[in-house]
């Protein structure tokens, strides 16, 4: 009898190698999907912790301190609590609209992260219309809020959904005009090109100095889009109990808060990209690496330090919306609409005309 043990071992090792290769390929295919999701999740948890700590400091009290060191895990504890709570449905409401509304609000905002360049060569999709894609996708979120308000069969919820839709329409136009001014200055609507256009003159090349009026209008409009104080009329507790969230419980109730913080984070990221130079920094860090003769790591170092700079600018900017929550009173609905249509819209139009004129004269 002839033994074929070496051949059998070779076949087994080859099949094991092919299996490992296929497994590695599957895991590698999912890494680009799970990495941004993990990063966004951590970013939202950091925002929640920052808001609670800053709010506690402003009110001269102690913030969360029991869940993890310095209360870092408090947001995870709240999320776990909502995850295991019962999902209740209104007796005479539209069940489909009631269930789909929160998902539309979250998914539409998550898609916006696909065009955000976190650093050099760290962007999922570099489109020629990146900034306008963000505006188009973010305008879908109020539709989900309106569906939630209508499907709840509650007058407070329906009024909250109507307010969210009216507020989004009022402030979407000034926001778009400010973005259009930035596109004219950069000769591109790609988020990557806009950041690179600000890198020519370092710190003084940021669009913040060339578009100060546009920056202020963009800041106010983004606060209104995120429904942050003083623009939180869709969920005003004193008037509408909780607005479109009134009939929700459990994980669906938590999805609205996730959508709110996701929207706040992506708005702050776009402020960093459009006005604060993105991943660029005026310090020439590359010369430090040349001096220590470690140029081989530059391919890894540049995207990493770029992502760190982008996130640092973003979280520093987040102090503004968090602070305004405890310093400014809520506007009335008529004041909010007047501010959007009678003030911000004409000023943003004038800013666009000035930008267009300056670009024409510079040719």
Swiss-Prot record:
It comes from the Eukaryota. Keywords: Chloroplast, Membrane, NAD, NADP, Plastid, Plastoquinone, Quinone, Thylakoid, Translocase, Transmembrane, Transmembrane helix. Disulfide bonds: none annotated. It is a multi-pass membrane protein. It catalyses: a plastoquinone + NADH + (n+1) H(+)(in) = a plastoquinol + NAD(+) + n H(+)(out); a plastoquinone + NADPH + (n+1) H(+)(in) = a plastoquinol + NADP(+) + n H(+)(out). One of its GO terms (cellular component) is chloroplast thylakoid membrane. Its main location: plastid. It is found in: Plastid, Chloroplast thylakoid membrane. GO terms for molecular function: NADH dehydrogenase activity; oxidoreductase activity, acting on NAD(P)H, quinone or similar compound as acceptor; quinone binding. NDH shuttles electrons from NAD(P)H:plastoquinone, via FMN and iron-sulfur (Fe-S) centers, to quinones in the photosynthetic chain and possibly in a chloroplast respiratory chain. The immediate electron acceptor for the enzyme in this species is believed to be plastoquinone. Couples the redox reaction to proton translocation, and thus conserves the redox energy in a proton gradient. Belongs to the complex I subunit 1 family. This is NAD(P)H-quinone oxidoreductase subunit 1, chloroplastic. It comes from Morus indica. The gene is ndhA.
């Amino acid at each position: 009898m002839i033994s074929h043990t070496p051949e059998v071992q070779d076949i087994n090792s080859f099949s094991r190698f092919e299996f490992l290769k296929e497994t590695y390929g599957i895991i590698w295919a999912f890494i680009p999907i799970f990495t941004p999701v993990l990063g966004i999740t951590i970013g939202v948890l950091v925002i929640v912790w920052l808001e609670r700590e800053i709010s506690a400091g402003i009110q001269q009290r102690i913030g969360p301190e029991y869940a993890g060191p310095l209360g870092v895990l408090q947001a995870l504890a709240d999320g776990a609590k909502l995850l295991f709570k019962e999902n209740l449905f209104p007796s005479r409401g539209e069940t489909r609209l009631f269930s789909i509304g929160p998902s539309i609000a979250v998914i539409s905002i998550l898609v916006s992260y696909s065009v955000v360049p976190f650093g050099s060569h760290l962007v999922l999709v570099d489109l020629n219309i990146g900034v306008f894609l963000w505006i188009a996708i973010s305008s879908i979120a109020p539709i989900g809020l309106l569906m939630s308000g209508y499907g709840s069969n509650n007058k407070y919820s329906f009024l909250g959904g109507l307010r969210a839709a009216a507020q989004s329409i009022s402030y979407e136009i000034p926001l778009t005009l400010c973005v259009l001014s930035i596109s004219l200055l950069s000769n591109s609507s790609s988020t990557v090109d806009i950041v690179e256009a600000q890198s020519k003159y370092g710190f003084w090349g940021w669009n913040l100095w060339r578009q100060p009026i546009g920056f202020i209008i963009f800041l106010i409009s983004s606060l209104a889009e995120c429904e942050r104080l003083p623009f939180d009329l869709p969920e005003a507790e004193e008037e509408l109990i909780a607005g479109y969230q009134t009939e929700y419980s459990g994980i669906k109730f938590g999805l609205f808060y996730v959508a709110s913080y996701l929207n706040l984070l992506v708005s702050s990221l776009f402020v960093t990209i459009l006005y604060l130079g993105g991943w660029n920094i005026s310090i020439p860090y590359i010369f430090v690496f040349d001096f220590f003769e470690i140029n081989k790591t530059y391919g890894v170092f540049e995207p990493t330090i770029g992502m760190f700079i982008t996130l640092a600018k973003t979280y520093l900017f987040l102090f503004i919306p968090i602070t305004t929550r405890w310093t400014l009173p809520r506007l009335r609905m008529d004041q909010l609409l007047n501010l959007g249509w009678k003030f911000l819209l004409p000023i943003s139009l004038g800013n666009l005309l000035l930008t267009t004129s300056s670009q024409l004269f510079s040719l």
